[in-house]
Amino acid sequence: MDGTDVTMLMREIGVRARAAAAELAFAEPSRKEEALNAAAEAMLARSDEILEANGRDLAFGAEKGLTPAMMDRLKLDAARIDGIVEGLRAVAGQPDPVGQVIAEWDRPSGLHIRRVRTPLGVVGVIYESRPNVTADAGALCLKSGNAVILRGGSESFHSSGAIHAALQDGLRQAGLPVDAIQRVPTRDRAAVAEMLRMVEHIDVIVPRGGKGLVGLVQAEARVPVFAHLEGICHVYADGDADLEKARRVVLNAKTRRTGICGSAECLLIDRAFLAKHGPVLIEDLLKAGVEVRAEGELAQVPGTVPAQPEDFGREFLDMIIAAKVVDGVDEAIAHIRRYGSSHTESILTENDATAERFFRRLDSAILMRNASTQFADGGEFGMGAEIGIATGKMHARGPVGAEQLTSFKYLVTGDGTIRA
């Protein structure tokens, strides 16, 4: 496909998306719910087709030499399809954000003012190897009254296509425009460049992928962007941490799934914790098969690898973690401010004052206490699913669910009211 063809294709998709968004903005909540539940049923009915398509993508990924972490992101099985189905149903059951009254008040002039949620319009989602993003993004945009243009990575091309077909089955059954959820039907990377320039047709871009993709989008987009560059998540074991809680959380935060943005990439151990309990957290990680890149006295623990300066502030997305000792919560905070990506940080402590200091003095999108960073997920936050984790400070922040995909407008009612 040459450049002219891609430009024309993307313009056509954009025009259709804008028309669908205009209709979707006032669709009844019951019809959107029906479409999502029908899409969930279609996903189950098409599960063999989806798995066959995923097999083709996995073969393609193996040929390209994808890392184990990327292959894990790409892989679908019956359990993961069930998870997608549950996510669709959960989004269907969420309150519809469109039209919700955020605030209302009366003015001395006699005006009654309401601020109500309204769709953004058209959302463009650019993602890499996770085919489940097709379902999550499609569902959340539909729930929030937005049309969406999906551009999945070349690795997940067939899987995303099969999932997209199920989403459109749901739209048809509910009598909603199938153009409300469109997928870019080409692997040509020129389509991404076109999306980033489509200011007339797309209201916001959400990139979902690695640092290279997100950095490219942020650098070149003319359309506003919701994004995070990396998930450099920290776990800090305070001197007042409960040992057994700390052991459970650290292992889970690193090893449950290493290829997700909520995986812990750096462990900070308070010197007081080390004095009480020794290097037990490091030993647990080593026994679990994690490569621990340790600094200072932690590098003396047998089996660790000496940390290099570049290991701090690095997203490994693998069975690797950086580790160092800190003198108190303030040094932990300083380290996170320097090396973190404003994604998710967790403090392990039984001391309320220390936890409050950690929460008040850090400004990451998600801050946790005595909980695994792997909970940094819209589904775990009760959103049903997420379109991504936003770490910026404008508009959406943290897990981006249906509510975060809305703006607002003011509805002002008078009674022949005029301004003096």
Curated annotation (Swiss-Prot):
GO BP term, example: L-proline biosynthetic process
CDD domains: ALDH_F18-19_ProA-GPR
Localisation: Cytoplasm
Pathway terms, separated by semicolons: Amino-acid biosynthesis; L-proline biosynthesis; L-glutamate 5-semialdehyde from L-glutamate: step 2/2
Highest taxon of the lineage: Bacteria
Presence of the UniProt keyword Phosphoprotein in the record: no
Record InterPro entries: Ald_DH/histidinol_DH, Ald_DH_C, Ald_DH_N, Aldehyde_DH_dom, G-glutamylP_reductase_CS, Glu-5-SA_DH, GPR_dom
Keyword Cytoplasm: yes
Entry GO CC: cytoplasm
Gene Ontology molecular function terms on file: glutamate-5-semialdehyde dehydrogenase activity; NADP binding
Gene3D superfamilies in UniProt: Aldehyde Dehydrogenase, Chain A, domain 1, Aldehyde Dehydrogenase, Chain A, domain 2
Swiss-Prot/TrEMBL catalytic activity: L-glutamate 5-semialdehyde + phosphate + NADP(+) = L-glutamyl 5-phosphate + NADPH + H(+)
Keyword annotations from UniProtKB, A to Z: Amino-acid biosynthesis, Cytoplasm, NADP, Oxidoreductase, Proline biosynthesis
PROSITE patterns documented for this protein: PROA
Pfam families (UniProt xref): Aldedh (PF00171)
UniProt EC number: 1.2.1.41
Family: Belongs to the gamma-glutamyl phosphate reductase family.
Function: Catalyzes the NADPH-dependent reduction of L-glutamate 5-phosphate into L-glutamate 5-semialdehyde and phosphate. The product spontaneously undergoes cyclization to form 1-pyrroline-5-carboxylate.
Listed name of the protein: Gamma-glutamyl phosphate reductase
Organism (species): Cereibacter sphaeroides (strain ATCC 17029 / ATH 2.4.9) (Rhodobacter sphaeroides)
